[in-house]
């Protein structure tokens, strides 16, 4: 769990996302409150519930990007799901409890990675012994092993092929469903899970010494880990630090005066209620309480309104944050400021072909102008419009780049106007092309 202060979290998000200060503040405070709660005494800690967030804003302004960056920052079990993927219990499809099961799997992977680092030194030694066994045999003399060990550590044997016995992951195990078990995905039991612990199937693989190293180190590290303790730690991390980002929540709103296909939409909202309020979800690793999991919901609310959500669901998302539509100045900053801005990406991509791309300040202004003009005349899709415009402008350069090795190409305002200016002016054309 990260112990960044809200100010540090906001400045970290600023490196990748332009504007939207209110949304960044809200998620940074929510994330810091997770840490604050863990510093409290036992009885009070149970009483402090997370303040769930609803982010409202047009498409392409940074809602999903905030979630993605937050996931990397959080150092906590984090999952991003689209609300539209789920159906009401009883309908064919995934029920919302699957969110928590997936979150547990994410946490187990995180904890396993962390614990592998703790036993890495011992695992390296064990993996080295297995490679030596494959190279010179288990019964070889100490002198032979030592001479091969020196060569192995010096990297002289990296390209040599060896045969190693590895644990089969059970990926091909047949699955069968147990009727009546909660959640179809949970009910699908793999025979590999049942028989995996009884001897565990192994298979022989032929690999180079270099390729086998990581595989064997991970396998030896897993042997040194206590799987029951690992699962318990993961469940504890989910219950106390877990974060669920629910995207596209506006798509499961039931709009006034509409019926028909809306039944399962409202059903999904009803199923989300206990999950957000706090319930116990059964997973194959054990029961998980959702009382202290933080839920961040987001939606564009183009057609539906936040008030179209079930009143109970609105009450369980007490913090409302509105993200503003992007201005021309924002568009210009998006092209240049973030660490992996669009312009930096295109320059780096063309550099691989030996082409140096230079985009002038006037060209950046022109790109921002075109994106804003098309957004206002056709459909406002926010910053995503910049990708479309950039692709059109650099289409010719990208196509001919392999033949222009060593060239320096300058893109100015006139070049931008030549390639997309007419399209931007003609709303009918831009409707189909931009």
Swiss-Prot record:
ATPase subunit of a proteasome-like degradation complex; this subunit has chaperone activity. The binding of ATP and its subsequent hydrolysis by HslU are essential for unfolding of protein substrates subsequently hydrolyzed by HslV. HslU recognizes the N-terminal part of its protein substrates and unfolds these before they are guided to HslV for hydrolysis. The gene is hslU. A double ring-shaped homohexamer of HslV is capped on each side by a ring-shaped HslU homohexamer. The assembly of the HslU/HslV complex is dependent on binding of ATP. Its main location: cytoplasm. This is ATP-dependent protease ATPase subunit HslU. Keywords: ATP-binding, Chaperone, Cytoplasm, Nucleotide-binding, Stress response. It comes from Rhodopseudomonas palustris (strain BisB18). ATP binds at residues 18, 60-65, 247, 312, 384. NCBIfam families: hslU (TIGR00390), PRK05201.1 (NF003544). SMART domains: AAA, ClpB_D2-small. GO terms for molecular function: ATP binding; ATP hydrolysis activity; peptidase activity; proteasome-activating activity.
């Amino acid at each position: 769990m990260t112990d960044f202060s809200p100010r540090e979290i906001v400045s970290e998000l600023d490196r990748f996302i332009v504007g939207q200060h209110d949304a960044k503040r809200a998620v940074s405070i929510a994330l810091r409150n997770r840490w604050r709660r863990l510093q409290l005494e036992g009885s009070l800690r149970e009483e402090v519930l997370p303040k769930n967030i609803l982010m409202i804003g047009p498409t392409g302004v940074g809602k999903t990007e905030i979630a993605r960056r937050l996931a990397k920052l959080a150092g906590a079990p984090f999952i991003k799901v689209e609300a539209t993927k789920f159906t009401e219990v009883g309908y064919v499809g995934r029920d919302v409890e699957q969110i928590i099961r997936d979150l547990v799997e994410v946490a187990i992977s995180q904890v396993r990675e962390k614990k592998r680092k703790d036993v890495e030194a011992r695992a390296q030694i064990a993996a080295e012994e297995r490679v030596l066994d494959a190279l010179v045999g288990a019964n070889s003399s100490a002198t032979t092993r030592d001479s091969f060990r020196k060569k192995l550590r010096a990297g002289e044997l990296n390209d040599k092929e060896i045969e190693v016995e590895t644990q089969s992951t059970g990926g091909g195990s047949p699955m069968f469903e147990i009727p009546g078990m909660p959640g179809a995905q949970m009910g699908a039991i793999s025979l590999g899970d049942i028989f995996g612990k009884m001897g565990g199937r192994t298979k022989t693989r032929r690999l180079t010494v270099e390729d086998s190293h990581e595989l064997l180190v991970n396998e030896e590290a897993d042997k040194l880990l206590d799987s029951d303790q690992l699962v318990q730690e993961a469940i504890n991390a989910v219950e106390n630090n877990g974060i669920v980002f629910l995207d596209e929540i506006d798509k499961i709103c039931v709009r006034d005066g509409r019926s028909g296909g809306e039944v399962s939409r409202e059903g999904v909202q009803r199923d989300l209620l206990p999950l957000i309020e706090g319930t116990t979800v059964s997973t194959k690793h054990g029961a998980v309480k959702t009382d202290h999991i933080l839920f961040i919901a987001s939606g564009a609310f183009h057609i539906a309104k936040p008030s179209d959500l079930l009143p109970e669901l609105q009450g369980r998302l007490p913090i409302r944050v509105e993200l503003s539509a992007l201005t021309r100045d924002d568009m210009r900053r998006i092209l240049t400021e973030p660490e992996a801005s669009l312009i930096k990406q295109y320059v780096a991509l063309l550099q691989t072909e030996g082409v140096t791309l230079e985009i002038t300040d006037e060209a950046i202004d022109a790109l921002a102008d075109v994106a804003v003009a098309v957004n206002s005349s056709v459909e406002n899709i926010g910053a995503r419009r910049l990708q479309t415009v950039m692709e059109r402008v650099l289409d010719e350069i990208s196509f001919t780049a392999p033949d222009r090795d060593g060239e320096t190409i300058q893109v100015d305002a006139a070049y931008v106007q030549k390639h997309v200016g007419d399209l931007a002016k003609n709303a009918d054309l831009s409707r189909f092309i931009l």
